[in-house]
């Protein structure tokens, strides 16, 4: 869009089926514009109004255009349906992603899809950033784990699909990638691989991808509950700069735990006291102020800034209480199977070591995943139920928007597929309108490296040749991706004339047969290997094979 005589701002409006469903965005003043349009209906002729704005925001000129779009892909057809709607929402657009919702999408207040990404995400989907971009969990690379394989490749992406940075995570990622502070380092949930999984937090330098701090939960908690591979199952982490603490939602310990991020000292534990009774950690458990039932296998536990109880001596913690018991049934004989989930708010007096439950709103029973989100500007409380149990008509997900004070349902939508989370689609239209700029070092972090070994250890060429269609091979940049089903390969040997390297996952032993059906592309970095002509051998299903694949590093 070109304006010759002076600089103007631009506002676009995609006309909705109702006035409240209009989607608008503004671009700062300039003499020419690239106008990103978000909010088009799929498979329709969309009316879009473009307006020129002067310095005072007055409309100086306008034009109406029509944009025709393609229909939704089959996987998103009829994926959402309103149960009840007030006709307006605190969110212009709500994004849904992860689990079986492989293509993220956003819907409006009427339950109509207005945006989607035609690229699949990993199991946990994406994570919003303060700059209105997202960290995208990619499907290109997975590292074997003790249970579920974990995605190693993360992208900083905008809503137009432009990738600005790429982060490699050697141990893979799960459940949470969140900024420590706006624009700052990333806190990532990963796995220690030391007989346990989904039990580790890493702080990733935003500029380099290097790990600058970490916490393995078994370093601060040692007790009888370490008896499971997935003993902790951390699903949320966030940072409180005023106290230099992180808040962890530890699902399989039924606990929300606050830890000093520098000293790694436990500050307190929010949990039913009976769970920690008789252990060294019962002294950290907050004392109940009042009579209430605690959470079971919670998700999205966050400390919020809003003072919801009118007491400046307390902090508020919101969470989604799945109220489901899958692990440790023998340890928890007090579980009340209500077959409901709940949006909870706790008020914590840290000085006195007490906790009070100040809000409890029931939702449909969602056994895993899901999210609770308090929206301060509207005073609305969102319940994003990602894995609904026993739903009528086979629906797998449900989202709610409540008035916080009255607990009245303002909007409710059912979804055909399970999802990991749903949240507001926050958009910076000026960022989307800007030409894409890449940092010189836009690939950051590192993967598990092949280790150089003695040449004589692998002098003997394998007697067996692996059938050509058993594995797939693809080199992207300086990374070799080997496609296979989970835990079929334990070693990859790169045999050169002068150098030999081994990529070894032998010690990563699978504990759940379910994931043997998971097809993954194992990322093997090549940039640290010496110049040579290499043959690729593999230990495949405990057999030593020649793949008859070769490559050269010059």
Language-model features: where?
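Extracellular low-complexity, O-glycosylation-prone stalks/linkers
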Residues: 9-22
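Short beta-strand segments within Ig-like beta-sandwich modules, predominantly Fibronectin type-III
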Residues: 24-31
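Histidine-/acidic-rich catalytic cores in large beta-rich domains
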Residues: 7-9, 34, 38, 45, ...
